[in-house]
Every structure is written in structure tokens, then in C-alpha cells.
UniProtKB/Swiss-Prot annotation:
Gene3D superfamilies: 3.40.190.80, Fructose-1,6-Bisphosphatase, subunit A, domain 1
Catalysed conversion reaction: beta-D-fructose 1,6-bisphosphate + H2O = beta-D-fructose 6-phosphate + phosphate
Organism: Stenotrophomonas maltophilia (strain R551-3)
Compartmental location: Cytoplasm
Pathway: Carbohydrate biosynthesis; gluconeogenesis
Segments passing through the bilayer: none
Cofactor note: Binds 2 magnesium ions per subunit.
PANTHER family reported in the protein's UniProt record: FRUCTOSE-1,6-BISPHOSPHATASE-RELATED, SEDOHEPTULOSE-1,7-BISPHOSPHATASE, CHLOROPLASTIC
Binding site for Mg(2+) 1: 90, 112, 114
E.C. number: 3.1.3.11
Protein name in the entry: Fructose-1,6-bisphosphatase class 1
Annotated keywords: Carbohydrate metabolism, Cytoplasm, Hydrolase, Magnesium, Metal-binding
Pfam families hit by this protein: FBPase (PF00316), FBPase_C (PF18913)
Length: 338
């Protein structure tokens, strides 16, 4: 029996009334763009795409050549199809409406074109993260404000991980599914349907080098994880950290765990490291659709009403019971302080 292609999967979702034709075509365009990015990434040094681009993004971070290339691939692929009203990228200061020469559709697309790009020169898995919102009604030329919707309003989200194989992980609000790129056929095929994150776990992913900057509930929570079976938790935990959110979250979707990037006082002006609109919201939806949870430590990520396009938040996501435990530490600390 032949495997289900992404095209067939999306058509079936349309026939079931879960997506419309425009959303189906938009996701297909994003998938094709990800295929192009996968080819560029896989060329590495042979394609002359490694190293810094000599420019910075709105966050003040140095851009890699592949950041710029991936951003341009996604913008160009989505400009002319008639499905989008505007795009927003982690690599751009402001959103970009579809040019006037092309028809505009009903959707807004947000993306991190190459998450984890600081690892690209050492051949670690990187990926593209994307989120789809509906454009507010009666907005002819959407600007940044049109994108400021809570994550619960997302109608689709996904990421494409460029590793030993290229995989597209997607939700349209009815489960989380993984598709693997068949390079010979040039199409994604369904390889894991309805991914499920185990409710309990003994693995956590965090950058321990920032420990001295954490607030008290984080110090207590991770301290108890490290204490193992002799400590308050009564079981041993393993730590994993790839420093590529796509790779860390993909592992959690595959076998469970909790991914943590907490608030820290290293730069108190920033509420967190990760971007709400480009990283936390799409990953939060994917994880929740796979039976997991996604919180800031104090509130559900998908409930946050954003106030700016490049807003940052702390992130705790993964196995439901472990996320709840981390939240409990934060709430207990806050309650004790009154």
C-alpha cells in the first residue's frame, strides 16, 4: 500500500471540511519552499552558503547567509499565489504585505526562516518554523497590528527540520502529523500520524550555563530534577540540549520530555529569549495538538495577547505532567510572596 503524500493528506482535510482550498494551497507552497531550503542547507560549504551574511536582524543578532537565503525563498514563494494578505518574519523589522501586482488572500503567514542557524556551520540540525493566522476582516492593507492575535487563533502551524532526513511536522488543528521528504519523488509523505507526547517524562532540555541568572522557582525546580531519585522528585532525569529549538522540540514530540527556555535576569529588559509569534506560538500549538502543554511558567502560551510583532516570552513545553510540575513551582513561589 502506498504512503499518503502531503498533497493527498491536505485534499482529504479539505474534503473533511477542516481546511479550505486556499489554506491547502498555502501549506503546499510553504512545503515547496522548505524543500528548496533543505536543498540549500544540504549543500553546505559546497554551495558557499555557510558563514555570516554581514548583516543583523531586528533583534540585533548577526544573520547567517542561510538566514537571508531562507527568508528570501519563503517571501518569493508566497508572494504571488493569491492565498496570503501579508507575511512577517523573524528576520524583518516589520510585516510585508503581498505586493499590489499580485492578488491578496485571507491569510497571514509568520515564520522563522532558519531556526538554530547559529549551528549551521557545525552541521547541527536546523529548521523552519511557521504559523498561519486569518487576516482580520475589513483590513485592505494589513500591517503589524493585523498579526497581533493570540496563539489560540492560529489555524495552522508547523516546522520543517533539516537533519539526516527532512521532515515537515504540521497541524491544522486536528492532531500533529509528521511527513518525510522523499527526495527521489520530490514530495513529502506521511510517516507519523497523530504524534503523541507521553504525559510523564524523565528528560529535560535546558541551557544550564544560564543557571546563575534564573529566578528562584527555576533554581528550585531544576535543582530537584538534578537531585534525581534521592531528591524530592524521587526519580532520575537526563538532560539534553542541542541549542536548536526545532531539533529539541522534535525530539520531545517523538519521545517525550520538557523543553525549557526560562526568563532570566541576564537581560531583564527582555521577557524571555524566544519569540512569541515565530517560535512559541507555532510550537505551542503543535505540542498541544500532540497531547502536551506549553506555558511560560505562569500562563498558557496560546492565551497571550501579543502587543508587538517581535515579543519574547519564557517557554516551558512538552510532556503535560512535567510542564504542570514546573508551573506549580512558579505559582507556589508567587503565592508565598503574596
Amino acid at each position: 500500500m502506498s504512503r499518503t503524500s502531503l498533497t493527498r493528506f491536505l485534499i482529504q482535510e479539505q474534503h473533511a471540511g477542516r481546511i479550505n482550498a486556499d489554506l491547502r494551497q498555502l501549506i503546499a507552497v510553504v512545503a515547496r519552499a522548505c524543500t528548496s531550503i533543505s536543498i540549500a542547507v544540504s549543500k553546505g560549504a559546497l554551495g558557499g552558503v555557510l558563514g555570516d551574511a554581514g548583516t543583523g536582524n531586528v533583534q540585533g543578532e548577526a544573520q547567517k547567509k542561510l538566514d537571508v537565503i531562507s527568508n528570501e525563498i519563503l517571501l518569493e514563494a508566497n508572494a504571488w499565489g493569491g492565498h496570503l494578505a501579508a507575511c512577517a518574519s523573524e528576520e524583518m523589522d516589520h510585516s510585508q504585505p503581498v505586493p499590489d501586482i499580485y492578488p491578496r488572500g485571507d491569510f497571514l503567514l509568520l515564520f522563522d526562516p532558519l531556526d538554530g542557524s547559529s549551528n549551521i556551520d557545525v552541521n547541527v540540525s536546523v529548521g523552519t518554523i511557521f504559523s498561519v493566522l486569518r487576516c482580520p476582516t475589513n483590513v485592505e492593507l494589513p500591517g503589524d497590528d493585523a498579526f497581533l492575535q493570540p496563539g489560540s487563533k492560529q489555524i495552522a502551524a508547523g516546522y520543517c527540520i533539516y537533519g539526516p532526513s527532512t521532515q515537515l511536522v504540521l497541524t491544522v488543528g486536528h492532531g500533529t502529523h509528521a511527513f518525510t521528504l522523499d527526495r527521489e519523488k520530490g514530495e513529502f509523505v506521511l510517516t507519523t500520524e497523530n504524534m503523541q507526547i507521553p504525559a510523564a517524562t524523565q528528560e529535560f532540555a535546558i541551557n544550564m550555563s544560564n543557571q546563575r541568572h534564573w529566578e528562584a522557582p527555576m533554581q528550585a525546580y531544576v535543582g530537584d530534577l538534578l537531585a534525581g531519585k534521592e531528591g524530592a522528585r524521587g526519580k532520575n532525569f537526563n538532560m539534553r540540549w542541542i541549542a536548536s529549538m526545532v531539533a529539541d522540540v522534535h525530539r520531545i514530540l517523538t519521545r517525550g520530555g520538557i523543553f525549557i527556555y526560562p526568563w532570566d535576569k541576564k537581560d531583564p529588559s527582555k521577557a524571555g529569549k524566544l519569540r512569541l509569534m515565530y517560535e512559541a506560538n507555532p510550537m505551542g500549538l503543535l505540542v498541544e495538538q500532540a497531547g502536551g502543554a506549553a506555558w511560560t511558567g505562569r500562563e498558557r502560551i496560546l492565551d497571550i495577547q501579543p502587543d508587538q510583532l517581535h515579543q519574547r516570552v519564557p517557554v516551558f513545553l512538552g510532556s503535560r505532567e512535567e510542564v504542570a510540575e514546573a508551573v506549580r513551582y512558579h505559582h507556589a513561589h508567587d503565592d508565598a510572596r503574596g
